[in-house]
Amino acid sequence: MKTFSAKAHEVTREWYVIDATDKVLGRVASEVARRLRGKHKPEFTPHVDTGDFIIVINASKLKVTGNKTLDKKYYRHSGYPGGIYETTFGKMQERFPGRALEKAVKGMLPKCPLGYAMIKKLKVYAEATHPHSAQQPKALEI
């Protein structure tokens, strides 16, 4: 029996919605990354984007364990000498509620054109409403 290899035009994608209220950041991010990659499907193929679309609502209510609200740091650089900026998880959640989850998921995906295509299937919203009701997403419990 030959090894099965999925073709890009044969992949069927589902839409899922995850409510992140009082969920731990890393646990949500790892499950989202797994589903974006398509590893939960029997037809998973490493070189083909077989993943599903994921909608995360209530991203502003994500939690982290321990003292990471103050201790976890995010860094960025302006490109100029001495132009490094750091932000804590708490400040990031106040200012950009979905960005911490996006950065966590992006770090778990491949760093190649296929990974960049996968991250585009992630939709993160700070509140409970989202504009994707026409796709009839299924609720996914984590």
Curated annotation (Swiss-Prot):
Family, as annotated: Belongs to the universal ribosomal protein uL13 family.
PANTHER family from the xrefs?
LARGE RIBOSOMAL SUBUNIT PROTEIN UL13M (PTHR11545:SF2), RIBOSOMAL PROTEIN L13 (PTHR11545)
Question: How does this polypeptide assemble, per the annotation?
Answer: Part of the 50S ribosomal subunit.
Annotated gene: rplM
Can you name this protein? Large ribosomal subunit protein uL13
Residues annotated as transmembrane: none
User: What InterPro entries does the record tag this protein with?
Assistant: Ribosomal_uL13 (IPR005822), Ribosomal_uL13_bac-type (IPR005823), Ribosomal_uL13_sf (IPR036899)
Q: Which Gene3D superfamilies match?
A: Ribosomal protein L13
Matching SUPFAM superfamilies? Ribosomal protein L13
